């Protein structure tokens, strides 16, 4: 086996194309904190590092735990190919977990969120092959990422806006996870009503943070168009290729952040710089580009 093959297999193990979206989710929380006070760049960076390290830990632990199942159903993965020893994955997962907690330890509240994410990773890893309800801890892992970024950069209480972006990420992640599970079981396809309803629920949840006496959902809905158009395109292509559709849904996660952040910059009293709006599309493009190198699933 070549070194290039081993590195490609490792990049696939850690689901490299999804890392930009993880960083973007955490950054969205830090950006939200910056609306009330100047952003604390070192705290934002450590929060992003914590989120990414925990994500790496989760993927390594998942592939270690599922190695026997993968030998039968995903033989192209690194452990069935015997590119690495299973113990090396477990050791690296533990190291990433501890590093993820350590980088969040400067703030007790962000440490609590990081520890919660790690706990959810363990629950998901143990249950995802046996229960469809495992999509909930997976969704909560995503939902807690903006909270990690917010609490690392702010000593203020959790705001309704933070809860809404967390809820939007929860809905999107649970939706795509349910679709991914059903595509491996042809007799359990989700209904068309669900396929069309869940992206709308995500968009409405994002925009609900901005509805007030002067701005209604009618004024705000264009900001959700990038997310909605991409997601509905992914759902359309899902009928031709489950792999393509699910990969597109994963790449589109930063567009949830974008739909949430754009109205802040458009507000007359906005303190959110337009430059902050560059992060979600950059994460989206980077993630989609990385999918050409290794798979996102």
Q: Which residues make up each language-model segment?
A:
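N-terminal, positively charged, Ser/Thr/Ala/Gly-biased leader segments
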Residues: 2-27
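Select subsegments of transmembrane alpha-helices in polytopic membrane proteins
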Residues: 12-21, 85-94, 133, 137-138, ...
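Divalent metal-coordination and catalytic microenvironments
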Residues: 14, 66, 258
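Membrane-embedded alpha-helical segments that form the functional core of polytopic membrane enzymes
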Residues: 22-65, 73, 97-104, 109-124, ...
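Acidic (Asp/Glu-rich) catalytic motifs at the cytosolic membrane interface
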Residues: 50-81, 86-88, 175-188, 290-294
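Membrane-interface helix-loop-helix junctions at boundaries between adjacent transmembrane segments
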Residues: 123-135
């Amino acid at each position: 086996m070549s070194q290039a093959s081993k590195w490609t297999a490792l990049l696939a193990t850690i689901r490299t194309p999804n890392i930009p979206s993880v960083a973007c989710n955490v950054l969205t929380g830090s950006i939200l904190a910056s609306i009330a006070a100047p952003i604390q760049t070192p705290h934002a960076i450590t929060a992003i590092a914590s989120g990414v390290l925990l994500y790496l830990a989760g993927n390594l632990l998942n592939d270690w735990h599922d190695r026997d199942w993968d030998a039968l159903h995903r033989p192209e993965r690194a452990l069935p190919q015997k590119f690495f020893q299973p113990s090396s994955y477990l050791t690296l997962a533990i190291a990433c977990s501890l590093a993820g907690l350590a980088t969040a330890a400067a703030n007790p509240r962000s440490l609590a969120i990081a520890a919660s994410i790690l706990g959810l990773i363990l629950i998901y890893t143990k249950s995802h092959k046996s229960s469809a309800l495992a999509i909930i801890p997976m969704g909560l892992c995503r939902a807690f990422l903006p909270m990690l970024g917010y609490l690392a950069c702010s000593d203020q209480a959790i705001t309704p806006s933070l809860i809404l972006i967390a809820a939007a990420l929860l809905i999107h992640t649970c939706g795509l996870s349910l679709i991914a599970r059903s595509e491996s079981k042809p007799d359990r396809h989700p209904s068309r009503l669900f396929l069309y309803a869940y992206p709308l629920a995500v968009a409405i949840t994002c925009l609900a943070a901005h509805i007030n006496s002067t701005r209604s959902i009618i004024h705000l809905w264009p900001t959700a168009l990038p997310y909605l158009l991409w997601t509905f395109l992914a759902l359309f292509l899902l009928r031709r290729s489950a792999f393509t559709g699910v990969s597109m849904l994963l790449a589109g996660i930063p567009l949830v952040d974008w739909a949430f952040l754009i109205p802040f910059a458009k507000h007359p009293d906005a303190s959110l710089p337009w430059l902050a709006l560059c992060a979600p599309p950059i994460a989206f493009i980077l993630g989609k580009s990385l999918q050409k190198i290794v798979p996102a699933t």
